[in-house]
């Protein structure tokens, strides 16, 4: 296959919207989704908005939703970006998108409908874990920034 499709399996993404990514694939190296009318708890939205502010300060990346796991990536782009040890375990896509932009890849954003979670509960972003996750990801942002500056 020439492309890799990444999509969460919690029912918040509508697989019928994959065609939007497929139709846009020739316009960019990575096609990434952003949530229209995000259907998450308020604390998740707040945490994400704050993280996006910090992220855009560090990387000067202008993505609407850099953490969203609904993407279509060309195989050669994926292979060129897979050789790094993630610095942000709960923020993989934040890091992946920053590395793609720093390598000069073009990213196209596609708005997608976002639904309430159908299956399971979040294991990562539980309220009691947010301070620890914020600290780990902040340190991860520093590591990624340093790594990108030294290459």
Q: What positions do the PLM features span?
A:
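C-terminal, non-catalytic tails of nucleotide-sugar-dependent glycosyltransferases
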Residues: 136-151
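Short beta-strand-to-loop acidic/aromatic patch adjacent to the donor-nucleotide binding site
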Residues: 1-12
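Residue-level signature of catalytic and energy-coupling elements of molecular machines
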Residues: 10, 54, 74, 100, ...
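Acceptor/aglycone-binding surface of glycosyltransferases and processive sugar-polymer synthases
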Residues: 3, 15-90, 117-138
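Catalytic donor-sugar/metal-binding loop of nucleotide-sugar-dependent glycosyltransferases
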Residues: 88, 97-115
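Active-site loop/turn elements of alpha/beta-hydrolase fold enzymes
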Residues: 9-11, 35, 112
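DNA-recognition element of transcription regulators
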Residues: 94
């Amino acid at each position: 296959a020439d492309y890799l499709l990444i999509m969460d399996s919690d029912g918040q993404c509508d697989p019928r919207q994959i065609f939007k990514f497929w139709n846009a694939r020739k316009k960019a190296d990575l096609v990434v989704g952003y949530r229209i009318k995000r259907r998450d708890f308020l604390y998740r939205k707040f945490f994400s908005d704050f993280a996006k502010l910090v992220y855009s300060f560090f990387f000067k990346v202008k993505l609407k939703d850099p953490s969203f796991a609904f993407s279509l990536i060309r195989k050669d782009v994926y292979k060129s970006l897979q050789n790094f040890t993630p610095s942000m375990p709960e923020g993989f896509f934040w890091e992946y998108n920053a590395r793609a932009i720093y390598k000069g890849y073009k990213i196209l954003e596609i708005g997608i409908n976002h639904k309430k979670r159908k299956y399971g509960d979040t294991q990562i972003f539980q309220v009691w874990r947010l301070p620890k996750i914020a600290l780990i990801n902040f340190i991860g942002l520093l590591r990624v920034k340093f790594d990108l500056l030294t290459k």
